[in-house]
Amino acid sequence: MAERRMISKKVIYKNSFLDLSEGAIALYMFLIIEADDDGFVDGLRRIPRCPFATEENLSLLINSGYVIKFRSGVLLIAHWKKQNVVARDRYTPTEYKAEKAQVYIDDDGSYRRV
């Protein structure tokens, strides 16, 4: 799995992102750091040291379309493919295959539910 992550100004400089609380913005950054090469994170428990890892901040990210939450508790960074391209020789496919089967990548490079 790649160890570097990118954050795109095209995503984080949108008014809808800047209108989020500071806690939700910080949580988004932590989620990006913890995500696998396809943008999946094993829920909030994956980032226990982040003081902003609250259900309230997560709900803000979900309702704003920045994170997708699955029934399993797994999270997905909706704009992952817009921000991160992992070299083929460093890419490790996600272990969350059931969740990945529930989304597709739209024309603008964002994950959407099927």
Regions found by a protein language model. Give the residues of each.
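Short acidic, hydrophobic short linear motifs in intrinsically disordered regions
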Residues: A35-F52
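Short, amphipathic alpha-helical interface elements at domain boundaries
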Residues: A2-D38
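Surface-exposed beta-strand edges and their flanking turn/coil or helix-capping segments
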Residues: I32, D42, D89-T92
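Winged-helix/helix-turn-helix nucleic-acid-interaction surface
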Residues: M1-V11, S16, P51-V114
